[in-house]
Amino acid sequence: MITIDKILEILKNDHNFREILFHEHYYYNWTQNVTFNALSYDSRQISSDTLFFAKGATFKKEYLDSAITAGLSFYVSEIDYGADIPVILVNDIKKAMSLISMSFYNNPQNKLKLLAFTGTKGKTTAAYFAYHMLKVNHRPAMLSTMNTTLDGKSFFKSHLTTPESLDLFRMMATAVENQMTHLVMEVSSQAYLTKRVYGLTFDVGVFLNISPDHIGPIEHPTFEDYFFHKRLLMENSNAVVVNSQMDHFNIVKEQVEYIPHDFYGDYSENVITESQAFSFHVKGKLENTYDIKLIGKFNQENAIAAGLACLRLGVSIEDIKNGIAQTTVPGRMEVLTQTNGAKIFVDYAHNGDSLKKLLAVVEEHQKGDIILVLGAPGNKGQSRRKDFGDVINQHPNLQVILTADDPNFEDPLVISQEIASHINRPVTIIIDREEAIANASTLTNCKLDAIIIAGKGADAYQIIKGNHDNYSGDLEVAKKYLKR
């Protein structure tokens, strides 16, 4: 519940209030008592006591008209649509929605310890490590790209890396109702660009890495803009953890100089001194030997990042150790074995940098033929297509099958051809993803060989023309073709 007086107070304090406009009259205050028992940005979810946010570049007046027909009596907007109900006019609808949602749900962020991860890659894995560390002796909730849990028992698929602010604070409130003590979440650059976490301060923020990604017409116009929005997490955290090996580390180091911080990686005190496939040793604040199920040194580095963050939250080394040993992540380096001994690796690697690291890990363990099944999503991250080609060109013996990966409103054949245009040798294009995996499964001969299925991980859908069409998932499809 929230009153009109409280809403106006919030907006005025944030210098985000213009006026209330009703029947061509302007109001700085509203003398009538009005209470809202629901918030919505979806015109299909409206009741008479709902406060509606008219937001988005594609918003149309007919959406508002539909909401008014359903009983809407007040809305918030940057634009006066000339409707027959009062409008609270603001300078920034996204800021308004975040702060009003925060208050509506009784400031749940103050009742949880908040841990956030940002980075081009590794956010989900690091979040899972932290979740398992905290779970040993606490009650963490988690919002991740892969899965969300608000009670530690039931999990559901997330549609955005970081939810819309209204949904975010509703989820936090549910976690509080479920007596959760901590919230682990991923914070994307888009979350700051679209102000989904506006006004939110995290107890610990972690910056894992940075490389060009999410650059395109509907995302970030330049790498500089992408990097800037990533760094905003540092300015909105009470303590930070940063990878000293990341590109452009110096500016981040300067930015966090006066914030309590820990660095990890080769240029810090917190460093891996010994790395095996399923164990590693760390010196520094986390000094110990750790068992780990996820192969690859980059996963060990993600574990260190999560461990340092949890240490800041009061988690013991023993709980950190147990958490790392227990962590698995759906769609991250999941391994199957064909009857001929060849390995199939299913991984979410979905940009050039993560593909590069995935190939390095697989090639370290598999010395025979390696077949890569790969695609790129439509209508976002166009720069990935060239990045994939550049990485593939560094592996001349890699056999490549290009396929569909969430083509959305683009033609998957055109996407595949664009990737192929950046590759300096012939590749195979099989648009049907299951058919591509089936074809790859016929190309192995012995235990030294491997198939890498990259991009979708555990996603049990294909995004086609705006819809989430059913798809068994790469792991389930691969299981059909183990006999060789």
Curated annotation (Swiss-Prot):
InterPro entries: Mur-like_cat_sf, Mur_ligase_C, Mur_ligase_C_dom_sf, Mur_ligase_cen, MurE/MurF_N, UDP-N-AcMur-Glu-dNH2Pim_ligase. The keyword Cell division applies. It catalyses: UDP-N-acetyl-alpha-D-muramoyl-L-alanyl-D-glutamate + L-lysine + ATP = UDP-N-acetyl-alpha-D-muramoyl-L-alanyl-gamma-D-glutamyl-L-lysine + ADP + phosphate + H(+). Keywords: ATP-binding, Cell cycle, Cell division, Cell shape, Cell wall biogenesis/degradation, Cytoplasm, Ligase, Nucleotide-binding, Peptidoglycan synthesis. Its main location: cytoplasm. Carboxylation is probably crucial for Mg(2+) binding and, consequently, for the gamma-phosphate positioning of ATP. Pfam families: Mur_ligase_C, Mur_ligase_M. One of its GO terms (molecular function) is magnesium ion binding. One of its GO terms (cellular component) is cytoplasm. A motif (L-lysine recognition motif) lies at residues 405-408. SUPFAM superfamilies: MurD-like peptide ligases, catalytic domain, MurD-like peptide ligases, peptide-binding domain, MurE/MurF N-terminal domain. It comes from the Bacteria. Pathway: Cell wall biogenesis; peptidoglycan biosynthesis. GO terms for biological process: cell division; cell wall organization; peptidoglycan biosynthetic process; regulation of cell shape. Its EC number is 6.3.2.7. HAMAP family: MurE. PANTHER family: MUR LIGASE FAMILY MEMBER, UDP-N-ACETYLMURAMOYL-L-ALANYL-D-GLUTAMATE--2,6-DIAMINOPIMELATE LIGASE MURE HOMOLOG, CHLOROPLASTIC. Catalyzes the addition of L-lysine to the nucleotide precursor UDP-N-acetylmuramoyl-L-alanyl-D-glutamate (UMAG) in the biosynthesis of bacterial cell-wall peptidoglycan. This is UDP-N-acetylmuramoyl-L-alanyl-D-glutamate--L-lysine ligase. The gene is murE.
